[in-house]
């Protein structure tokens, strides 16, 4: 599988297997520097996998989880991350080849623990000095309009010190958050990359508004004309647009 994928993909691959023998076979035939995704805080896992990473020069992702599962608090996750870091260094793996994943919990099920992930990430970056990785879109699972949550959480995580985001690079909203963040944090000098990407683009909201105006004009009406609205809510909408508070209140009561 590794050979087949590398024959058509030029980007680095992340190898994962719960069986150390299978993982080593993949590492042995890998061409270049692989990434092992992942180890966790369990001693037996660290003892089996880290020597393989050292032997084959692989970078490794460490999950801040152990036999007790994902801890809700930031301190507990940082403690696991510290354990992984110490084991990796003891195995001879350079610190720059270690990426810690503090694990994203879904806001729909564990809303009060969302900030713990960001806090743990920040501590791993500032106190442990390790690189960080995070599955961003997990945050919005089970909720509507997921892009709103994903882009906001991505921005929070980047500000906390996120190095690698597991995300959909085809999402225009997500990429816009990255480009804008790099401008505002001076990572994009002179806003060069931002300008190259967006100088000739029309925001989606502007394009939609223009399309609506064109549709209204095609019907021989002007924006705001009564022809735009119909049905039982039309009087209320017109009253709101004209700022007629009394009429709006009366129409609202009539609709209740």
Locations of regions flagged by a protein language model:
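ATP-dependent carboxylate/acyl-activation modules
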Residues: 1-10, 20-97, 105-133, 137-256
């Amino acid at each position: 599988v590794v050979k087949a994928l590398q024959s058509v993909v030029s980007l680095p691959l992340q190898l994962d297997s719960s069986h150390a023998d299978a993982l080593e076979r993949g590492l042995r035939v890998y061409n270049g520097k692989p990434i092992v995704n992942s180890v966790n805080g369990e001693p037996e896992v660290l003892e089996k996998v880290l020597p393989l990473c050292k032997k084959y020069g692989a970078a490794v992702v460490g999950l801040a989880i152990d036999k007790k599962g994902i801890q809700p608090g930031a301190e507990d996750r940082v403690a696991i991350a510290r354990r992984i870091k110490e084991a990796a260094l003891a195995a001879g793996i350079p610190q720059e080849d270690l990426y810690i994943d503090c694990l994203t919990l879904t806001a729909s099920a564990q809303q009060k623990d969302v900030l713990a992930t960001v806090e743990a990430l920040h501590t791993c970056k500032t106190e442990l000095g390790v690189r960080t990785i995070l599955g961003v879109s997990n945050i919005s699972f089970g909720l509507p309009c997921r892009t709103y949550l994903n882009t906001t959480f991505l921005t929070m995580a980047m500000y906390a010190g996120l190095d690698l985001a597991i995300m959909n690079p085809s999402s225009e909203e997500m990429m816009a958050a990255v480009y804008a963040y790099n401008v505002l944090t001076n990572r994009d000098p002179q806003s060069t990359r931002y300008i190259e990407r967006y100088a000739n683009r029309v925001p989606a909201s502007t394009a939609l508004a223009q399309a609506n105006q064109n549709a209204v004009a095609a019907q021989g009406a002007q924006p705001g004309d009564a022809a735009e609205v119909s049905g039982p809510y039309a009087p209320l909408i017109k009253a709101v647009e004209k700022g007629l508070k009394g009429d709006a209140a009366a129409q609202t009561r009539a609709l209740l």
